Amino acid sequence: DQAINITNRIADIEKCDALLVTIPAQSLRTVTISLSDIVPASVPLVIATQGIERGSLMLMSEVMQSIVPPTPYAILSGPNFAREIAEGKPAASVIASHHPQLADAVSFAIGGKYFRLYSNDDPIGTQVGGALKNVLAIAAGIVEGTRLGENARAALITRGIAEIARFAKAKGGREETLMGLAGLGDITLSCTSTRSRNYALGVALGRAGNPQKMDGGRAG
């Protein structure tokens, strides 16, 4: 897509309209520190990285905001497998920001006929859903791998959503955000599809009975 320019030139950051962040969660702090003197405060951040930082327990926006100058940011999250988007198959996602103009600009830039973006103003709840769904997906995979049945998996997912919603509220987000694409949608995809790496890891764990017995599957 011409709306997204991929470059390995650090200097290009100073000229971009917005910076799309896709760095792995546990590497985000190190990379952000290395770029902290380069990223202008005028360049908005679009954070697509999902996760919670080990140790600090910070969300990705919190990690970046603790390092770079204060700048508008948006969170891109939803039930999306990158391969299907690349193949032009229909998909929807969430762009969450306290800055409506930024959310609209991102939607216009990367949305399209087959990729629909819905905006909300709850970046905290959106991030919590995207991060904790990974834990729930592993647990759902374990239920499948140990053959505990569909009833057990449905119960696990339902109670897991309720717990994630409470966590989101405790972090300052809104529980209802978890009923949308960045919560229920992402959880449904990740907890039911063998193409989900976390679900596949859980299945492998359940079948092996012990992490030490795993033969190295699709964890990640």
Located regions from the model:
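NAD(P)-dependent Rossmann-like dehydrogenase/reductase catalytic/cofactor-binding core
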Residues: K133, A140-E144, K169-M179, G183-G220
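A general structural signal for well-ordered alpha-helical segments in protein cores
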Residues: L28, M60-S61, A103, V135, ...
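Short, glycine- and charge-enriched coil/turn segments that flank and shape catalytic ligand pockets
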Residues: S36, P40-S42, T71, P100-Q101, ...
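N-terminal loops that bind phosphate or other acidic moieties
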Residues: L20, A91, A152, R218-A219
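Glycine-rich beta-alpha junction loops
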Residues: Q50-I52, S77-F81, H99, D121-G125, ...
